[in-house]
A protein has these predicted regions:
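A short, Lys/Arg-rich alpha-helix, primarily the initiator
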Residues: 1-23
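The alpha-helix within a helix-turn-helix
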Residues: 21, 32-33, 62
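Short alpha-helical DNA-recognition segment
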Residues: 25-45
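DNA major-groove recognition helix of helix-turn-helix/homeodomain DNA-binding modules
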Residues: 56-71
Length: 79
């Protein structure tokens, strides 16, 4: 049986997060504050594709940017 497997594109997801943050006129510090993160470094790590937000942060990012959680992520389908 053939099926498609979805793989998270961390770099493209990070670029999407950066675009959303900039479009919302938020600094790294602003967004870190809204998410109650200890350091804005986490935002830099997400935007560079080094790390991805956990489920709780994805949920809160979706609320901040007024969109669905799954729309924050960039997925690549492979066979």
């Amino acid at each position: 049986m053939d099926y498609q497997k979805a793989i998270l594109d961390k770099v493209s997801t990070g670029l999407r997060l950066r675009m959303l943050r900039c479009k919302s006129a938020l600094t790294h510090e602003d967004l870190a504050g809204l998410l109650q993160l200890k350091s804005p470094r986490v935002i830099y790590d997400w935007e560079s594709g080094m790390k991805i937000p956990n489920a709780e942060n994805l949920y809160n990012l979706a609320l901040i940017f007024n969109m669905k959680m799954e729309d924050l992520l960039v997925m690549i389908c492979s066979f």
